[in-house]
Amino acid sequence: MPDPIKFISIDPINGMTQKKPGIVCNLINGEWVTTDNIRKDIVDPMNGEHFLQIPDTTDHSNFINDINLQKSFGTHNPLYKPERYLMLGEVCAKAAALMAKPEVEHYFTKLIQRVMPKEYNQCRGEVIVTRIFLENFSGDGVRFLGRGFSNPGDHQ
């Protein structure tokens, strides 16, 4: 791909083949971890070959231990960490701006199309909708996550 973006780690057009598969990792205790136990039931929709190395994670104890080690009280509370919501809003805005670049939009469109055989414009529509969501959410959307909602129902 011309002018690759720094975060790109796989080429959905010329990569992700049986000879050069895409590799999926588990995130455990802040580290990306691979495993020898790989799923064999996910095949390339274009030719039926195995093109992804996806961990067949059946032992969840590492994830549970990782969660138990994390401090959770106040971490996501907007009353304790208002700067976190500002930062998350900035992340959404920057992601949306990046997705507006034609080469990034094309990359994600081809990436979706590679794992889900759809027409180019269908996959591009998914990228555009996600970008628009991030644009909208980057404003007050993140701040409103800490707000309570009460909606009247039709029950008695």
Residue ranges of each PLM-predicted region?
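Glycine-rich loop-to-alpha-helix module at the N-terminal edge of alpha/beta enzyme cores
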Residues: 49-154
